[in-house]
Amino acid sequence: ATGTLQNKDDVLNSTKKRRLKKAKKSSKPIFIVTPDEAYDNELEKSSDYKTWSFKADNVRDFAWASSRKFIWDAAGFKQDSIENPLVMAMSFYPNEGEPLWSKYSTEAVMHTMAVYSKYSFDYPYPTAQSVNGPVGGMEYPMITFNGPRTELEDDGSRTYSRSEKEFLIGVVIHEIGHIYFPMIVNSDERQWTWMDEGLNTFLQYLAEQEWDINFRSDRGEPRWITDYM
């Protein structure tokens, strides 16, 4: 959700709290809810109710997601910022997204913050999240929804192509980038499109090429502007 969880003692068991504490000090994603645990949760419906409390400062919108199918991984992203030196990068996704999501989603979240902060400004929020949702991609303060999943094969395994891998990495970069523009700068994306999609697409291209020089970016190459000239 948008914000920082305020009542973890009420909603997380000791195992999840221990894993989350470990993730804060890890530069690589750590499972807070494992794939096996998510599968077990999917089979067992709960009749209990829990209230999750979040607090957010300096936001203009709010979003949240909830599913017993969610795998949850997290890592601590360190940045050279006195005001906000540590950001919790997190991803939430079902087993239908594996093995793609656990390999690349949270890594792409952290990569985006590293590149965007280098070329623009430090990420000011305490969390940055990527959620596998029913959309191609959509952003809100601190949380994004991204669509790609893997293909189910006849033998029950799940696979993904290079295109699907690059789609996930690209959409995560793009939507996390939108937390910078327009969410943080608070511009009107309908009136000032160049301050939203324009700046974001430019930085997305830089981030994709820094991820992999052979990344097949579908936007951002300067020579493509000739189509509009």
Model segments located where?
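Hydrophobic helix-coil surface modules that form long, contiguous segments used
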Residues: 1-173, 202
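Zinc-dependent metallopeptidase catalytic helix centered on the HExxH motif
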Residues: 110, 114, 160-228
